[in-house]
Structures are given as structure tokens and as C-alpha cells.
């Protein structure tokens, strides 16, 4: 990030108002109007870590707090486009951690219909690289892609724990696709669509992958 403490034609000595600098540092949060929303929202928007919450001794307390937060968030109707865009990006970055922490997919999907930019395009053939154990428990994640190669990457890698991974296939419609890919997801070439699995007509297993070693 470019530092603007001294302009090219400025004198060598500059009086710096530290209070003004502090205000500038927090300007983005002021612009986003975060004071009107639950405090934990800043944790998501700032990309803070979730490991200390899930791996510490107070995980039950943190889970309760985050469930309350997600429930409260679902009651808001955000109107700030910059806020929505930032949330969309950070959801794609950390949704697997948020999902593990909250441990309530229905609660999360209800919230996402309010907080992600609505998809209104045509129906799409979509794929997901899912963990076999979670699939058999009906715990299918929200992240799908129109690129089968992306699903294969996850089914044979990150999600191939336990008994292995599977590539799932479905037809997503505007009634089941909550949001399309964020700019961040497109940059990563993952093309992640956020899906409400409760609204899918069918989900089929395309292929299996052996458990990941190591």
C-alpha cells in the first residue's frame, strides 16, 4: 500500500496529527457503517483467524456466540454495496472455517441469502468435491463450481480425508444458487457458486477418490 505521509513537493519536515492518522486507519470501517451491525462482523470482514477460537478451551462458548451472531446477521438487510462485496470475498476466503465453528449449516444458509449478492442467471451444471463421510451424513457444503477440474482438486485433495472424496454433480437454478463467484474466487480460478443444498432437486455422485495419505 502506498504511503502518503509526504507528497513529492512537500517540505522535509511534516507535523503529523496522530489522531488524524488513527481516524484514517479506521476510515474504511466507518465508510462500511459497521457500527450498525453485530460486532463479530468485523472478524469476518478483516479476515481474522478462526483457529484460536476452534482449538482453544472455550470452543463451546465461541460456538454459541457465533451462532447468535449468525442468527442476528440474518435479521439485517445490508444496503451498502461495498460491505456486501467485502463480505462476499471474505466468505469465499474463510467459509470452511466459519462452517466448522458455527456447526449449523441451516443457520448459515439462511444468513447467506441476505448477505451474498443474489444470482439471477440461467441454470448451471455444477460440481462439488466433497468428503465421502460428510456426503453420507447429508452434510454437503455450499461451495460448488461449474469447473469439474476444481471439484476434482478438492475431492482428491483437501476433502479426501477419512474414507476419501467424491465429485458431486447437480443442476443449480436461480432458486438454489445463492450467489455467483466473487472476484477473489475468479482470480483463484475456482469459480465458486454458493448453493443452498436444501433447494436442489437432485445430487448425483460422479466419481470417487481414495483417502488422502499423509
For each of these PLM feature ranges, what is it?
Residues 1-125, 132-142, 146-214:
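Conserved NAD+-utilizing ADP-ribose enzyme module
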